[in-house]
Each structure stands twice: as structure tokens, then as C-alpha cells.
Amino acid sequence: MSYNLYISNSNVLSILIIFLVINIIFIFLKIFKKENTDYKFIYGMFRTKKLMEIMKKISNSKFSKFLSILSLILGPILITLAVFFLFFGILTRTPTYAPALPGISYGPITLPITQTIISIFIAAFIHEFAHGILVYKNNLDLKSWGFFYLGPLMGAFVEPDEKEIEKLNKKEQIKIYSTGAAINIIAGLIFLFLFFSSLYIISIFNLATPYVKILYTLPNTYAYNVIPNNTILYSINGNQILYLNQIEGVLNNTKPGEYILLNTSAGLFNIELTNKDNKPFIGIVTEQEYDYKVPGIDFIESLLFWLFVINVGLGIGNMIPIYPLDGGKTMKSILEIFLDKKESRIITLSLSIILLALILYNISFIL
């Protein structure tokens, strides 16, 4: 599969508008909360001690005990999964570690701008909040916590005393380092359940009509620069197209070099099929879309889906054993159970360098 990068002009404009709004927010924070705000135009950070009391209360609850046990169990499992997905991506030439950049299309997959930005912020918020809960559970304190932005992306952070964490026994260290990823996995599964629930509600009440959109055309094909971007595909050779798999069904009855008639919202197009892997290929990148009868329901459905994807992606990706990611810190604590600190540090550093090089190689598949 091709993973050509693509971003539309409208998405570029939307990203710039969001970036401008975030800048305005941080300018006001810099004016009224100067001592808590660091603002550098493309980067900003705001520290606060609000909500820390809530973290403390939760740290004394049964939920924190459950989260603590779950983190200890999931930590090593997520490290294993993170490494597995990296090697799986390399072996299959799939960019499993491609960055979640809003508005970017990786082949047929487009990350919606608003939903992606919201999902990244929520995933980062609950991730860091969970770290804070287990820090307090171990009777340690936080210097502060807050949120930041880098370009159009927003996230959250907590500032524990790392030296105090290193004084804890290795089991407690593993719990603290793994808990952010653990809560992301839990949240991701909850959002997945809500997503499928929304699909069920939409289907039983017939709240949406399916259709297929042509996002853009690919170079070295006869469709390139012939069919406009963001065109609705109605039919191929008279066969109605409502779902993506129907396109493949029609193409199975054709051969490379044959002409097909595409009926679209931009008019009729007689396109010659090219040969790709000995199969007929139109040269269009399509996306499944729905015409929703209730305003806003499509946004909610999309948001729930991307909340699932981003949370699970952050939960697994952050546990790749590369220092100073949580996975690297967790791996170091695990190694120190069996080895001395110097040996653990050397192994962790060596592993980090190797895995970082492999991740960069994996990401290169999108170029």
C-alpha cells in the first residue's frame, strides 16, 4: 500500500486558525498569569496547582489501588507490544510509528484536524493525571502540573521529583512510569465501546446515508489531475457505489488497460485503468463518508473513534523502551531488579539508540 503524504489547502488554513487561537489564549495567560506562563509563539507552557487536590483525593481511593495493580501488570505487556508493532511495521513496510499529525493524509487515512487535536489533548491530560495520582499514592509531591502547546498541538504534563521517585522500590517505580499508558488503554477501550454504541444508534434509527468520496488522485495514473479533489463517487460503469468495498467488486470484472465510466458530483469521467501489482487500478484515494441527518452526530462519532485510536496509540507508543519515554524508564527499573545501576543504564541507553534508529526507519515508509 502507498502511504503518500498529503494535506489539503483547507486543512492548512484550519491548522493556522487553530494555531492562532491557541496563541491568543497564551498571550492572555502571559498577561494575566505571567509567573505561571512561558510563551514563545510556536511553543507555550502554563503551570498550575489547581486540580492537584483532586489527584490527592483519588490517590487514596480504591480506583488508585486498581490502577496501581493494573499498571504493574500492563507495563511489561505494553513494552512487548510496542516492540512487536515496531518490528511488524518494518517487516510489512507499514509506518506503525507515523506521527499523529492533524490534517495529514497517510495514503487513504486522513487525520481530521479538530478531532485529532482534541483527542491528543485529552489522551495527554488523562495520561499525566494518572501519573500524578500514583505519585501522590506513594506520598510524594508534585512541583506542579499544567498544559502546553507546540504548534497547533496541545498536551499536558506533571512535574514530579524524579530523584524522589528513584528512591522508591522498583515495583512502585514501574507502577508510576506505566500508569499513564495503562489509563490510556482503559480510556481507549471505553471510547471504542462508545464508538460502536454510536454506530448502533445511527444504524437502528437510520440517521445516516453512506457515500464514497474521492479525496485526491495519484500521479502516474490516468485519473491524475482529471478528477477534482473531494468529489463524490456515485457509480462505476452504472454500478451504484455507496461503500468502499463495492469499488473492488466492480474492478474485479475489469482488466488493466480497459476504460471505466465514473459518475461523480463533478461529472462523468472515462478513465483508463492502469496496472498495479497485476491488478486494475484507477488511481484515486477514497474515503467512506456518511450524510448525517442530525447535525453534529458525525463529529461525535469521529471524535469517539479518534479518541480510541490516539489513546491506544499513545498507550502503546509511549511504552517503547526508549529513554526518557515511560517505556524506557520502566525498562530501566525492571533491569535494575536483576542488574546493578551501571549495567542497567548501559543496556537502556544502547537499546534506546537501536530502537530510535528503527523507529526513524519505520517512519521513512511514509515518505
Segments the model singles out, each with a brief description of its role:
Residues 1-367:
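Hydrophobic transmembrane alpha-helices and their immediate loop junctions
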